[in-house]
Amino acid sequence: MHVKKGDKVMVISGKDKGKQGVILAAFPKKDRVIVEGVNMVKKHSKPTQANPQGGILNQEAPIHVSNVMPLDPKTGEVTRVGYKVENGKKVRIAKKSGQVLDN
């Protein structure tokens, strides 16, 4: 998977095309990610101990990983991801600027 939790990404297709956000969760086995503020759905919840009110909540739903691209830390544009070995470790790099994406 070319993106991971904490990456700043842009949605490149679908109803939320053009929106930017941070990845909150990644599900590699399903090839899906949850992006902050993207693909919002209404969830109906029963009253519980934690939420005695219950009601309708807005929350993010997973979207396919092919619909997001990481943002280049240098330019802020979308970029493809490359891989490079530095000091014996494999790191992700932005193809546009060559900057390392891994923190």
UniProtKB/Swiss-Prot annotation:
Keyword match Cell inner membrane: no
Residues annotated as transmembrane: none
Organism superkingdom: Bacteria
Gene3D superfamilies given in the database record: 2.30.30.30
The protein's assembly and partners: Part of the 50S ribosomal subunit.
Listed InterPro entries: KOW, Rib_uL2_dom2, Ribosomal_uL24, Ribosomal_uL24_CS, Ribosomal_uL24_KOW, Translation_prot_SH3-like_sf
SMART domains: KOW
Reported function: One of two assembly initiator proteins, it binds directly to the 5'-end of the 23S rRNA, where it nucleates assembly of the 50S subunit.
Lineage of source species: Bacteria, Bacillati, Bacillota, Bacilli, Bacillales
Pfam families in the cross-refs: KOW, ribosomal_L24
Family indicated by similarity: Belongs to the universal ribosomal protein uL24 family.
This protein's GO CC annotations: ribonucleoprotein complex; ribosome
Protein's name according to its UniProt entry: Large ribosomal subunit protein uL24
Gene Ontology MF terms: rRNA binding; structural constituent of ribosome
Keywords: Ribonucleoprotein, Ribosomal protein, RNA-binding, rRNA-binding
Gene Ontology biological process terms in this record: translation
SUPFAM superfamilies cross-referenced by the UniProt entry: Translation proteins SH3-like domain
Record NCBIfam families: rplX_bact
Keyword Nuclease belongs to the record: no
